[in-house]
Regions:
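Helical scaffold of the NTase/Pol beta-like nucleotidyltransferase catalytic core
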Residues: 2-61, 196
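Conserved lysine of the Walker
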Residues: 214
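Active-site nucleotide-donor binding segment shared across nucleotidyl transfer reactions
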Residues: 48-90
Length: 381
């Protein structure tokens, strides 16, 4: 079982079925050294689960102690599928049974669907896989991912946790309740620290006039982060505003844009994203309020991309055609002057004479490496 479920609580009375009437063998509490084969066991099982969940599946995580390299654990693979609609998971119970799982409903945690695979040998019960299904946006996803990633980022904490589990397994080899109770205080303290740490999200806003290359640079930054393994989301805000009609008085569609951003970020966060790169024009600090509503408590850094007016005009001509060209040329010049006068950026990056990869590298080195949490910054090469 993943560490944050505390214990396998009994289902509510309306979930009782005949399988609960069978006297169960005692569960052996066995904590073993980390096995490098665990990630592969997860990947193999994830492939089987993908075939079951199909279009309902958004992402699938390896969670719990077996997902933390070097951490001693009970040899149980904990898996967290993120789905679009939790209620539709009930229709998949038959397919899960065919994979050898026992459907347990919510099993004491509202909004969850829980399945386990187990067997009995020599009078003892052994679990091999636990599957905890949640709908995208569930706070329980944050709890599981925060706890896992915190232990990955802080090996000293993971070592203390391993020592505690090994001691408890020795004291209570066939008493899972006492084993879980013994972990409870450590888990609560660590979870509190992990969630505070998890909430530290870096949001990098790439601002600048029309034609300066915001989207191209944002894509290059995202490619670099992806290559380094940094979990993040990339969003072009203008694409989220493309809805007609706009709310009267909302000329640029910020209302629908922020509503769409909230949905996209919710899904990205449930997939494990810990950083947001967003391309959009920001003319005032007040325009960032909607972003703060979507990502509360985030560290927001505004990067203004700048270019000389002749270079800007050349770039606009390269990308715009037809009757809209003259408007975009005027708008680019207006925005360039307005953004320079407002000077609300935290970092100014001149783009004249620099290729897109060079600009992206400057942003990563000047902005992201210093501002990202240490475990993510260390991934950047």
């Amino acid at each position: 079982m993943a560490d944050l479920t505390s214990r396998e609580t009994s289902p509510s009375p309306d979930h009782v079925d005949e399988t609960m009437l069978i006297r169960r063998a005692p569960r052996e509490v066995k904590v073993v050294p980390y096995d490098p084969a665990w990630p592969q066991r997860f990947r193999e099982e994830a492939e089987r689960l993908r075939a079951v969940f199909e279009r309902e599946l958004i992402y699938i995580h390896h969670i719990g102690s077996t997902a933390v390299p070097g951490l001693a654990a009970k040899p149980i693979i904990d898996i967290l599928p993120v789905v679009r609609n939790i209620d539709r998971v009930d229709c998949l119970n038959g397919a899960m049974v065919e994979l050898g799982y026992e459907p347990m409903g919510e099993h004491g945690l509202s909004g969850r669907r829980y399945f386990h695979r187990r067997y009995c040998r020599d009078g003892a019960e052994y679990h091999t896989h636990h599957v905890h299904v949640y709908e995208s946006g569930s706070p329980m996803i944050d709890r599981h991912l925060a706890f896992r990633d915190y232990l990955r980022a802080y090996p000293d904490v993971a070592r203390r946790y391993a020592a505690l589990k090994q001691e408890l397994a020795h004291l209570f080899p066939y008493d899972i309740e006492s084993y879980m109770d013994g972990k409870n205080a450590f888990v609560k303290v660590t979870e509190h620290a992990a969630l505070a740490w998890w909430q530290r999200v870096l949001v990098v806003v790439l601002s600048g006039p029309v034609g300066v290359g915001k989207s191209a640079v944002a894509n290059e930054v995202s490619d670099s982060l992806s290559s380094a393994g940094v979990p993040h989301a990339l969003i072009d805000f203008d694409a989220l505003t493309q809805c007609y009609p706009h709310l009267p008085g909302d000329r640029f569609g910020n209302g629908i844009g922020y509503a769409n951003l909230a949905g996209v970020w919710r899904n990205a966060r449930s997939c494990g994203a810990r950083c947001l790169v967003i391309a959009r024009v920001v003319e005032t600090r007040e325009e960032l309020d909607g972003l703060r509503d979507v990502v509360p408590g985030a560290d927001i850094v505004v990067v203004r991309l700048a270019a000389s007016l002749p270079v800007l005009a050349e770039r606009v001509r390269m990308r715009e055609r037809g009757h809209g060209l003259e408007w975009h040329l005027r708008r680019a010049a207006e925005l360039a002057r307005a953004l320079e006068q407002a000077a609300i950026e935290d970092c100014l990056v001149q783009t004249d004479g620099h290729a897109v990869p060079e600009v992206a590298r400057e942003i990563i080195e000047r902005v992201m490496r210093p501002a990202l949490p240490g475990d993510l910054a260390s991934m950047l090469t």
